[in-house]
Every structure is written in C-alpha cells, then in structure tokens.
C-alpha cells in the first residue's frame, strides 16, 4: 500500500482506481488513441517523436525527434513497417504481470486471455504508452535497468537495449513515469517487485518528477476506465 500512496502523491492528479471494470486490450488501445489525439502536443513515450494520425492509426514523425530505425529492413528484405507505426506498449510487460498468475504457468499469455485478473491488467490504461513499433519489439519483455556506455542504435533517441542481458535503459525524461507505473501496477494488483527493482524505481521516481502531461493523461485514463 505504501507504494500506491507514494505513486498517487507523485502523480498528484491520478484519482484512486478502485472499481473492477474490465477493459479488453483492444478497447484499451482505442481509448488511448482518443486520449492522445485530444492532446496536439502528445508524443511517443521513449523517443518523444510527434505523432501523425491517420484516423486511429499513428505514425512517428522521425524528423521531429531524430529517430532512425535500428533496422531499416526486415530479415526478409522488406521495409520494417514497425519502425513507421505507433504501437501501444505495456510499460510493465504482460510477461511480468502475467507470469505471476497460475494461468501463465499453464499456457502463457494465450491461457491467461480467459482469466479476468489478467485481462484487467492487460487493459489497464495507466500501463499503456505509445511507442515506435520497432522499440516496442526490441524492448520485448525485458526488464528496465542501467546499461553501461551509450550505444545509440536509434539515432538521437536515447533508448538502449542490451539483447544478451535482456535489459532496456529508457531516457531520463520518462524514468519517473516508468517508476510510478510499476508502483501503481504492483499495488493495484498485488504484484511482486524485487528489492532491486524497488530501489532503482525509487531513484527514478525522485529524479524525474511528475510533469504536466502526466497530470493530464492519468485522470483521463482513470475516467475512461470508469465510464
């Protein structure tokens, strides 16, 4: 409970979410599109790219943020479409919260799709952010942490992935957002965080305070989950 209180205090404007309404992942993504389209200054989570909308589909404006794909082409030689589209990323990956449920042990994400507890976590709007598809793919279900050196694989986007170690290092500007999201998910759903995670996230939360967009985004997410 102390982590939930800490997260709520840091967020300042995020109302307590106590009801048990379940929103499917597909519906949650549609709600997030509405929230982000309502803010003309909204940008992608990791690279801070402006978002160009065509209907409900978003595309990252790479020129606005200096993002360049790690892979322009796929292994088959085709254009890397995921580098040109917005995807809705779980800040705390589905693997991290799903693997703490029995259904995951019985058959992974597919088995958990039928379980209310998993569906509720999967569709929680507070845990969803718009990311360049390539980064969503590269981050996979890797844990967040610090990576030695500054290997820039995505142009000016300060997002690093250590594939062998299965670790991703996000930009400083969103580390607090990540910390508050993890603490929220842990307390809202009774999920376990390691001692190392709590310590690291605590540092991130203090070094990156709540910004105006968080104050606007989180109440909107809460309202969308209630209505």
Name what the model sees in each region.
Residues 63, 69-227:
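Domain-level detector of nuclease and nuclease-like folds
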Residues 1-7:
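Sec-dependent signal peptide recognition
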Residues 19-85, 201-203, 216-220:
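Aromatic-lined ligand-binding clefts that engage carbohydrates, nucleic acids, or primary amines
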